[in-house]
């Protein structure tokens, strides 16, 4: 009844609702859901579950906060800017060593309880009996971290290779133990990891097939770890046994000492301190022995190659260039020049010169540069890789080998991108490197080293060459010392902007000559228009005349040098010899004597070296006379023993003319300000990319490509010591008439372009003499004439000895005093009237 009553009431209610809504269709009544009362026990369980979930969430949140805080603190410590990457790497290695000690104590000696017992139990659960070798593996990884440089490119390959070897070893250990099933037995075999690797293979393929598969996996991991391909394995094994690699002990014996071996064909030095990851490499020969390919940047050990033969750029028959290996500082001071000196003159001791530090090896900065270059090649999808590195004192040359079908232009077109990647502008490319199938990319070193002149002069090959005109140049990019013979150049053109190292080279050249030659062997003419560069050498016994500072006297000295050359050629022609060396030998032996009735006494001719510190000043003053004299000397003076060294900081076409370039075959270019200057001095680009401070390109006679070198440096104290040693032994014997201008007997009168206006010329003379100021601009202002006419007026006054020669932008020296003005004007008028009588 109750249910029916409820149903009726429900129907009544629904019908009322339908009527009120205006709905004619009746609906089925919805029975109400009965309320069910849950038992008390189930309600308590729900409350407990909710509380547990809440506690779990709270614990999880607390754990995440703690973990993030600890991780952030650890990362902040690891990324601290004041901790260098090398120190962080050492910290990880030391932590691994500590872990190896704990694992060894717990697994070998059952010590370090209670933590040791827990560590041993956990490790045996996962890797089983392999826990015995785990401390050795951890210690080996720590040693590798401490002794190698980090390399992000090789890290994935090394990790994958080591993982494959470890898993394959555990799987084989599981199979060797009979594939145990129970956890207790697996703890004595290969643990859970061995069971997870070897179990499915043995169940699905049987142990006879699973074992070879695991062995192949371990072999592939070994190939990844060493960076070797399968086809290279026979060559690697053959090279190991052929060279006795297993019987030799490669160590860092050259860290503190550097051997000097000038024997042709001697092996290069082994700089084994520049490693990437776990890779080891020495020279090219050692790379072939160990068989690691050089197709990937990460698999290359960047090294200091020390070749034993010159580059093909310096060929036989060209200017003699010696390449030498470094020497220790102790040997410099104990050796003397290996040749006999006639007479009482003694050459200055090499102990007066300072020696340099041992050469630096490649560093982490070089690895970073190589990685940056490789990254640029990868970004632009160029099939090429950095395969080698040669560190010099100033720059490092990275060798890039191209893939099949890749044009060299693709590399050279990326020069600016590479410069951007390595954060420098002075990137020079050498395509290709002489004697190698590779493109060279030369990048400046961040830690450049100084090259001392003493190191170059005391090198074995320099000492074995007893010629008195051998000079020390510096050290090339491969770390070899370079010296050259001026007699074989036979003339040298040096150019470079301010601060490029040109003056340092001139000083090194002069000190080289002073320490290797006597005044009877070499005489010098020093022309210094700057008046300060060559002043320290004033009074040395090798000088023919005092140091020349006036351009007019310099031109006269060059003319005298031409006459001296002609005189020597006449003597050689009369003696039927072709070179001054042969003439001197015959004079010493008595084969050449003066004819009967002649009072002349034949003596050996010394070499004459004329050094012009600034050619531009001479070409501005007397271009025609200077150029004619230089061209005649450079064309003919080689056999006469006369040599020129022309230096300028403005190698423009009006200074270094075509005739001068044609007859001066050897060039030395330091940093220039523009590409045009580089092409003027070298006939090719390159000098504009040099970084200054002695960085130069040496192009000897007969070479097609220049050699990059760091010029030798010498201090003012060393120069003073050597010059003093020379002055104390002899006084200079000057030759008369060297700087005296030759008079032709002709007289230059008033220029016809002036219009024979004597009044203008007389006014100009009166202005200059009365003011004692010989300036062309003053004549322009006072006389209101043009620049050309004022210049001709000044030249006319110079021909009449009223003013001195031009000194560039300075005012000319007035030679006539103010009280002599009247007599000078009368003399000019008298000469003009005499000339004017012939007119009409």
Swiss-Prot record:
One GO MF term attached to the UniProt entry: ATP binding
Domain spans labelled FtsK: 479-679
Biased composition (Polar residues): 1-26
Pfam families according to UniProt: FtsK_4TM, FtsK_alpha, FtsK_gamma, FtsK_SpoIIIE
Membrane topology: Multi-pass membrane protein
Entry keyword Transcription regulation: no
Location within or outside the cell: Cell membrane
Oligomeric form and interacting partners: Homohexamer. Forms a ring that surrounds DNA.
Domain notes: Consists of an N-terminal domain, which is sufficient for the localization to the septal ring and is required for cell division, followed by a linker domain, and a C-terminal domain, which forms the translocation motor involved in chromosome segregation. The C-terminal domain can be further subdivided into alpha, beta and gamma subdomains. The alpha and beta subdomains form the DNA pump, and the gamma subdomain is a regulatory subdomain.
Membership in a protein family: Belongs to the FtsK/SpoIIIE/SftA family.
Name assigned to this protein: DNA translocase FtsK
Species: Mycobacterium leprae (strain TN)
Gene: ftsK
């Amino acid at each position: 009844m109750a249910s029916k009553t409820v149903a009726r009431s429900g129907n009544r209610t629904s019908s009322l609702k339908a009527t009120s809504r205006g709905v004619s269709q009746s609906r089925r009544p919805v029975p109400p859901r009965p309320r069910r009362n849950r038992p008390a026990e189930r309600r308590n369980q729900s409350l407990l579950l909710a509380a547990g979930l809440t506690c779990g969430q709270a614990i999880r949140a607390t754990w995440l906060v703690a973990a993030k805080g600890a991780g952030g603190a650890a990362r902040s410590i690891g990324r601290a800017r004041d901790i260098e990457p090398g120190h962080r790497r050492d910290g990880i290695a030391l932590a691994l060593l500590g872990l190896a000690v704990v694992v060894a104590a717990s697994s070998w000696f059952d010590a370090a309880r209670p933590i040791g017992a827990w560590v041993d139990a956990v490790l045996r659960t996962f890797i089983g009996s392999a826990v015995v070798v785990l401390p050795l593996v951890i210690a080996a990884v720590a040693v590798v971290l401490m002794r190698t440089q980090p390399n992000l490119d090789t890290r994935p390959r090394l990790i994958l290779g080591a993982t494959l070897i470890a898993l394959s070893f555990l799987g084989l250990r599981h199979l060797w133990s009979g594939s145990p099933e129970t956890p207790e037995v697996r703890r004595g075999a290969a643990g859970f990891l061995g069971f997870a690797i070897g179990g499915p293979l043995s169940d699905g393929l049987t142990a006879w097939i699973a074992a070879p598969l695991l062995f192949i996996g371990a072999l592939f991991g070994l190939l990844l770890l060493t960076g070797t391909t399968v086809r290279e394995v026979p060559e690697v094994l053959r090279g190991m046994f052929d060279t006795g690699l297993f019987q030799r002990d490669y160590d860092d014996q050259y860290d503190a000492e550097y051997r000097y071996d000038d024997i042709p064909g001697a092996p290069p030095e082994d700089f084994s301190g520049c490693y990437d990851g776990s890779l080891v490499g020495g020279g090219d020969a050692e790379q072939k022995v160990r068989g690691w390919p050089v197709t990937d940047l990460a698999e290359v050990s960047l090294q200091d190659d020390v070749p034993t033969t010159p580059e093909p750029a310096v060929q036989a028959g060209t200017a003699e260039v010696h390449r030498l290996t470094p020497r220790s500082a102790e040997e410099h001071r104990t050796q003397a020049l290996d040749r006999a000196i006639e007479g009482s003159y003694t050459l200055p001791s090499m102990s007066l010169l300072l020696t340099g530090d041992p050469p630096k090896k490649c560093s982490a900065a070089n690895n970073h540069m190589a990685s940056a270059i490789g990254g640029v090649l990868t970004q632009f999808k160029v099939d090429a890789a950095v395969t080698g590195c040669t560190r010099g004192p100033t720059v490092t040359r990275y060798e890039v080998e191209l893939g099949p079908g890749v044009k060299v232009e693709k590399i050279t077109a990326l020069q600016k991108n590479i410069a951007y990647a390595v954060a420098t502008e002075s990137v020079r490319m050498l395509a290709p490197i002489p004697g190698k199938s590779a493109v060279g990319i030369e990048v400046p070193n961040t830690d450049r080293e100084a090259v001392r002149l003493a190191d170059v002069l005391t090198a074995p090959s320099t000492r074995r060459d007893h010629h008195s005109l051998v000079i020390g140049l510096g050290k090339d990019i491969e770390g070899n010392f370079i010296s050259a013979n001026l007699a074989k150049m036979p003339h040298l053109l040096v150019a470079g902007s301010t601060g490029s190292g040109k003056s340092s080279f001139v000083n090194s050249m002069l000190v080289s000559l002073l320490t290797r030659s006597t005044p009877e062997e070499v005489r010098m003419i020093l022309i210094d228009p700057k008046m300060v560069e060559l002043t320290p050498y004033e009074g040395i016994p090798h000088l023919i005349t005092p140091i020349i500072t006036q351009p007019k006297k310099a031109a006269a000295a060059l003319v005298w040098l031409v006459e001296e050359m002609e005189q020597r050629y006449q003597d050689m022609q009369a003696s039927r010899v072709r070179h001054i060396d042969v003439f001197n030998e015959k004079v010493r032996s008595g084969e050449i004597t003066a004819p009967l009735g002649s009072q002349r006494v034949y003596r050996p001719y010394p070499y004459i070296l004329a050094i012009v510190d600034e050619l531009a000043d001479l070409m501005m003053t007397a271009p025609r006379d200077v150029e004619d004299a230089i061209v005649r000397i450079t064309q003919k003076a080689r056999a006469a023993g006369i040599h020129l060294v022309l230096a300028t900081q403005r190698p423009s076409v009006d200074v270094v003319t075509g005739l001068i370039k044609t007859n001066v075959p050897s060039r030395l270019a330091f940093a220039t300000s523009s590409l045009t200057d580089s092409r003027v001095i070298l006939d090719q680009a390159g000098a504009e990319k040099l970084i200054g401070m002695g960085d130069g390109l040496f192009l000897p006679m007969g070479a097609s490509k220049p050699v990059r070198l760091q010029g030798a440096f010498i201090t003012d104290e060393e120069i003073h010591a050597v010059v003093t040693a020379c002055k104390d032994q002899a006084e200079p014997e000057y030759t008369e008439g060297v700087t005296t201008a030759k008079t032709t007997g002709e007289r230059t009168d008033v220029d016809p372009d002036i219009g024979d206006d004597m009044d203008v010329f007389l006014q100009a003379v009166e202005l200059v003499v009365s003011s004692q100021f010989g300036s062309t601009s003053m004549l322009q202002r006072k006389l209101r004439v043009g620049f050309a006419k004022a210049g001709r007026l000044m030249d006319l006054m110079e021909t009449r000895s009223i003013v001195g020669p031009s000194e560039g932008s300075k005012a000319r020296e007035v030679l006539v005093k103010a009280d002599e003005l009247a007599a000078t004007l009368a003399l000019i008028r008298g000469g003009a009237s005499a000339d004017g009588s012939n007119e009409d």
